[in-house]
């Protein structure tokens, strides 16, 4: 269905083909047997998070292993935090001691995981530990420190809810801002980025907050159905007595006002994120950082003033995601600024004049547009500016590809 939607956007369709979109149709396979520990880690990464695996595998070899292990370690920690079947008094000591297990050969955890992939990770965590211990002291120190701090933060918020905006910032710092801080230190330790990244904790934190707040906003329905609340009470309580009310159509207007309020808050991190990315030098690191950030502002644009957030799943089209990846891989920071401008500009034109947050929302969006124009030296116009295509050829390719997929199935291109 996703490729059919993209037929109306030939630029997206070509990008889908270029980045090998047919992988998304392949079922998740079982892990291969008799793998070395490092190979096992990469197999699990590819199986559990194809999008993250995609950007990791594009990195320099000196950086790739460290970030793969960093991801799996934090995924293991998250598996313990998220398992709602385990009593809190049982879970907390496992969380807070998890980082020490990184220095214990053979360390693994049983009794956690909401699905087979999560169970596979923590029950075979000794394989991750083995590769971790071979990374070198610099990387190990960073990963251990971030894991310890994140575990303590998770433990804190397992015992209380998010009420105020400062608490929302703190929660997002623990679960995502610390990831940004760790990544910056890893970038510097690899020698691929400057010393500035070793101490850029605030900027790195805001990169993480921008991503995490976007996820929390988008995932309203999934979280509320699981009896989880990550929207800060001080915000939603201005619009309703009970957060779950927003699922009912009669509360649509206050629901949208609350949604737009939180999106406006998330947008406050965008300028710092753009400044952070402007300091990156390595092309693969730029791609690694820029793709998720552009996806985030694209997702905020899709969610803004959209009541579907409260009734279903809102996300940018698969073809549009492919176009973002293709554009950034082709043009790096130039495409990043262009895309940020486009999404900010589109969102600004959707702001309802009577929305309570309208003035602040427009201020944030105009600031993003202004900075992007300054960085580029020109004002972008349309998505099709990113990559020059022969549109007759693209349309012909799209139609031909759709025919082949309809005739031979979605994995046709992966067989070529």
From Swiss-Prot:
Task: Determine if Membrane is one of this entry's keywords.
Answer: yes
Q: Which GO terms describe its molecular function?
A: squalene synthase [NAD(P)H] activity
Cofactors that this protein relies on: Mg(2+)
Instruction: Give the primary localization class.
Output: endoplasmic reticulum
Q: Which SUPFAM superfamilies match?
A: Terpenoid synthases
**CDD domains noted in UniProt:** Trans_IPPS_HH
Bilayer-crossing residues are 285-304, 386-406
Does the keyword field hold Transmembrane? yes
Q: What is this protein called?
A: Squalene synthase
Organism lineage string: Eukaryota, Amoebozoa, Evosea, Eumycetozoa, Dictyostelia
Q: What is its EC number?
A: 2.5.1.21
Annotated PANTHER family? FARNESYL-DIPHOSPHATE FARNESYLTRANSFERASE (PTHR11626), SQUALENE SYNTHASE (PTHR11626:SF2)
- Which InterPro entries is this protein grouped with? Isoprenoid_synthase_dom_sf, Squ/phyt_synthse, Squal_synth-like, Squalene/phytoene_synthase_CS, Trans_IPPS_euk-type, Trans_IPPS_HH
Q: Which organism is it from?
A: Dictyostelium discoideum
Provide the family line.
Answer: Belongs to the phytoene/squalene synthase family.
**The protein's annotated pathway:** Terpene metabolism; lanosterol biosynthesis; lanosterol from farnesyl diphosphate: step 1/3
Query: What Gene Ontology terms for biological process does this UniProt record contain?
Result: cholesterol biosynthetic process; farnesyl diphosphate metabolic process; isoprenoid biosynthetic process
Q: How does it sit in the membrane?
A: Multi-pass membrane protein
Q: What are its GO cellular component terms?
A: endoplasmic reticulum membrane
Q: Which UniProt keywords apply?
A: Cholesterol biosynthesis, Cholesterol metabolism, Endoplasmic reticulum, Isoprene biosynthesis, Lipid biosynthesis, Lipid metabolism, Magnesium, Membrane, Multifunctional enzyme, NADP, Steroid biosynthesis, Steroid metabolism, Sterol biosynthesis, Sterol metabolism, Transferase, Transmembrane, Transmembrane helix
UniProt catalytic activity: 2 (2E,6E)-farnesyl diphosphate + NADPH + H(+) = squalene + 2 diphosphate + NADP(+); 2 (2E,6E)-farnesyl diphosphate + NADH + H(+) = squalene + 2 diphosphate + NAD(+)
Its localization reads: Endoplasmic reticulum membrane
């Amino acid at each position: 269905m996703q490729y059919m939607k993209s037929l109306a956007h030939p630029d997206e369709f070509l990008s889908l083909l270029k980045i090998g979109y047919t992988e998304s149709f392949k079922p998740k396979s079982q892990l291969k047997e008799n793998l070395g520990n490092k190979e096992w880690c990469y197999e699990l990464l590819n199986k559990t998070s194809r999008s993250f695996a995609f950007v990791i595998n594009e990195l320099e070899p000196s950086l790739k292993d460290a970030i793969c292990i960093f991801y799996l370690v934090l995924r293991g920690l998250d598996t313990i935090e998220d398992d709602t079947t385990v009593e809190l008094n049982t879970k907390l000591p496992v969380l807070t001691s998890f980082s020490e297990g990184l220095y214990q050969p053979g360390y693994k955890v049983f009794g956690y995981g909401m699905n087979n992939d999560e169970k596979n990770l923590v029950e075979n965590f000794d394989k991750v530990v083995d590769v971790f211990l071979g990374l070198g002291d610099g990387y190990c120190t960073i990963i251990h420190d971030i894991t310890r701090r994140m575990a303590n933060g998770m433990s804190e918020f397992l015992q209380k809810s998010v009420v105020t905006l400062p608490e929302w910032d703190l929660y997002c710092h623990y679960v995502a801002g610390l990831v940004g801080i760790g990544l910056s230190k890893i970038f510097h330790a690899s020698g691929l980025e400057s010393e500035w990244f070793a101490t850029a904790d605030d900027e790195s934190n805001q990169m993480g907050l921008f991503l995490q707040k976007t996820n929390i906003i988008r995932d309203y329905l999934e979280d509320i159905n699981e009896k989880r609340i990550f929207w800060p009470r001080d915000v939603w309580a201005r619009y309703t007595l009970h957060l779950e009310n927003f699922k009912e159509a009669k509360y649509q207007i206050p629901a949208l006002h609350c949604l737009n309020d939180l999106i406006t808050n998330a947008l406050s991190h965008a300028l710092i994120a753009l400044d952070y990315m402007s300091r990156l030098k390595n092309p693969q690191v730029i791609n690694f950082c820029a793709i998720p950030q552009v996806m985030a502002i694209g997702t905020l644009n899709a969610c803004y003033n959209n009541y579907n957030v409260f009734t279903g799943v809102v996300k940018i089209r698969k073809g549009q995601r492919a176009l973002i990846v293709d554009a950034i891989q082709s043009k790096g920071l130039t495409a990043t600024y262009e895309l940020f401008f486009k999404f900010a500009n589109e969102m600004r034109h959707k702001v309802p004049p009577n929305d309570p947050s309208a003035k602040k929302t427009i201020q944030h969006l105009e600031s993003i547009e202004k900075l992007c124009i300054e960085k580029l030296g020109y004002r972008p116009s349309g998505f099709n500016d990113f990559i020059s295509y022969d549109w007759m050829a693209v349309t012909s390719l799209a139609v031909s590809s759709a025919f082949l997929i309809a005739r031979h199935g979605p994995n046709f291109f992966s067989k070529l």
